[in-house]
Regions:
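Hydrophobic, aromatic-rich transmembrane alpha-helices
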Residues: 49-55, 155-156, 219-227
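Transmembrane catalytic cores of multi-pass membrane glycosyltransferases
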Residues: 1-40, 93, 142-148, 162-227
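Transmembrane-helix motifs of polytopic, lipid-linked glycan transferases
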Residues: 43-66, 70, 108
Length: 227
């Protein structure tokens, strides 16, 4: 707060991490006079996630608004169950702003892309796609940013073509993701927290956590199919 909003972004980028979306969102409450209510921030973040899940459900599942809302709330609860640090995501502002809005951006991106893929081609759709691309590339969910390349490959193989505007979007996504991944702060943080690749114990811990998360994610998919 003392060094200013934009200098704070640069400070985090150079000394902590490259996830500029999280840094940007987490800094907003500190520049709003009188905003000292973590509950309000968490509520806004959670509401945005529920809204994005609702839009996703409405886009891919043809059911009425009431049932769409019920399914959206149910899926949101399952997402929390599948999160190993669920309490942190719900109650800690930093973790809340780190993951919930970024996941919401991904769901909105997929929903909008589905509309474009099925023939809708309005300028507002592309503006939304570009805006979401900027947010996703700067998030901690970099694996999702890279996985979108699969969509591009699918279009090239199955449709034998790809929209020029989508090529621009993927170009933005790739460049901005590299800006995130190659941030000086990432290396600084790894050094400070002693996360060395040669540490066998750390690697096994990472593997165990990864397997746990995969099991939880598959359980979410299983329950979703039961709907």
């Amino acid at each position: 707060h003392d060094i200013g909003f934009w200098k704070t972004q640069a400070q985090f980028y150079n000394n902590w991490e490259g996830s500029y979306t999280h840094t940007f969102l987490a800094s907003i409450p500190h520049i709003i006079p009188g905003c000292k209510a973590p509950f309000l921030c968490n509520f806004i973040s959670l509401s945005f996630l529920i809204y994005s899940v609702y839009i996703f459900v409405r886009t891919f599942i043809k059911i009425d608004k009431k049932n769409s809302l019920i399914v959206s709330l149910y899926l949101t609860v399952l997402l929390f169950i599948a999160t190993s640090g669920g309490a942190e995501v719900r109650f800690w502002v930093c973790a809340n702003f780190t993951y919930l809005p970024e996941l919401a951006l991904v769901l909105l991106f997929l929903s909008r892309y589905h509309l474009l893929y099925n023939g809708r081609n309005k300028p507002i759709d592309w503006l939304v796609i570009f805006a979401l691309t900027i947010g996703i590339a700067g998030s901690k969910l970099t694996f999702i940013a890279f996985s979108f390349i699969c969509i591009l490959i699918h279009d090239l193989i199955c449709r034998r073509k790809i929209d020029k505007m989508m090529i621009i979007a993927y170009g933005m996504l790739t460049i901005l993701t590299m800006v995130n991944v190659l941030a000086p702060g990432n290396l600084v943080r790894l050094t400070d927290e002693h996360m060395h690749n040669a540490d066998v114990i750390s690697n096994f811990t990472l593997l165990d956590n990864t397997i746990y998360r995969l099991k939880m994610q598959f359980s979410v998919i299983f329950y979703a199919f039961l709907l």
